[in-house]
């Protein structure tokens, strides 16, 4: 093989989920760049692959990318893998592939496992258009800002989340996006694989009853529907439902305003006006 870079997808859980081609290429390349050499070595040993590994992660990728491109230009062939799944999707690799493209190095993808796609295709949510935004920020304020920024997208929203933040994130989804359909995938392709469906609040209540929350999560949220100016559910009821789910009153008003295509002031007037027939829009 002439010098080139292969971007190779590896299993996200079940070790049978790898292609024949991926195994063959990993046996033939001069080196394999990976996030954690120990994790990748266990994977390689399982398939009888003995090629040398090089660490490539977020803390060294800028300098390492230049080094690896230079080696490829000298005729070596390398492979890029992540700890699990497809590289570059919320994993290191962008700088290396970008540098390769800039240098005129040939880059080939070996497609395979991806938690994003595995979760999406079993979700039951629309897949004709989706927006993947990786991991949400760890801080609540920043997390809610991201959710609000994509609230009007007419696409299924997809995020990754860690087990220690999943219930907080579901609470933020309720506060910012309301009662949209939500699907959560956990431990995909592994022994305890699970798909949870409902509203964000329903799934959160299910999770908090467990002794422990483990595994990596993929969170998918139904797309924003075009406002038709009408609803069978009164605005007051929508707000009461959100408050009952633990959402602050002003956050509930903000969420309902977005869903109904109204300003926060208009919603506030509707629920603060003189008592009488309930108004809805």
Set out the residue ranges of the language-model regions.
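Generic beta-sheet signal
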Residues: 4-8, 74-82, 130, 155-159, ...
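A contiguous loop/helix-start segment that scaffolds small-molecule binding in enzyme catalytic cores
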Residues: 2, 77, 156, 163-281
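Glycine-centered tight-turn and secondary-structure capping sites
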Residues: 92-94, 249
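General beta-strand structural signal in soluble alpha/beta enzymes
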Residues: 34, 107-112, 159, 184
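Conserved helicase motor
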Residues: 55-62, 136-139
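Short active-site oxyanion
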Residues: 25-32, 104-108, 156-157
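Glycine-rich, flexible N-terminal cofactor/catalytic loop recognition
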Residues: 1-58
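Class I SAM-dependent methyltransferase SAM-binding "motif I" and its flanking Rossmann-like core
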Residues: 95-153
């Amino acid at each position: 093989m002439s010098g080139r870079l292969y971007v190779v997808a590896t299993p996200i859980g079940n070790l049978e989920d790898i292609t024949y081609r991926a195994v063959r290429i990993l046996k033939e390349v001069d080196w394999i760049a990976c996030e954690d050499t120990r994790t990748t070595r266990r994977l390689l040993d399982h398939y009888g692959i003995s090629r040398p590994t090089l660490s490539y992660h977020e803390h060294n990728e800028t300098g390492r990318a230049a080094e690896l491109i230079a080696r490829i230009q000298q005729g070596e062939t390398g492979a890029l893998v992540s700890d699990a799944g497809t590289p570059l999707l919320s994993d290191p690799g962008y700088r290396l592939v970008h540098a390769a493209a800039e240098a005129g190095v040939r880059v080939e993808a070996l497609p395979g496992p991806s938690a994003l796609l595995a979760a999406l295709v079993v979700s039951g949510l629309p897949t004709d258009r989706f927006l993947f935004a990786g991991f949400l920020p760890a801080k609540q304020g920043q997390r809610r800002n991201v959710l609000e920024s994509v609230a009007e997208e007419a696409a299924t929203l997809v995020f990754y989340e860690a087990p220690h933040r999943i219930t907080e994130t579901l609470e933020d989804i309720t506060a910012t996006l309301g009662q949209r359909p939500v699907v959560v995938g956990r431990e995909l392709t592994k022994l305890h694989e699970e798909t949870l469906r409902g509203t964000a609040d329903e799934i959160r209540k299910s999770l908090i009853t467990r002794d422990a929350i483990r595994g990596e999560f993929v969170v998918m949220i139904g797309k924003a529907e075009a406002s038709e100016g009408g609803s069978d559910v009164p605005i007051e009821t929508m707000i009461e439902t959100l408050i009952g789910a633990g959402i602050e009153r002003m956050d509930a008003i903000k969420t309902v305003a977005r869903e109904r295509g109204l300003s926060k002031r208009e919603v506030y007037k509707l629920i603060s006006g003189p008592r009488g027939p309930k108004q809805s829009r």
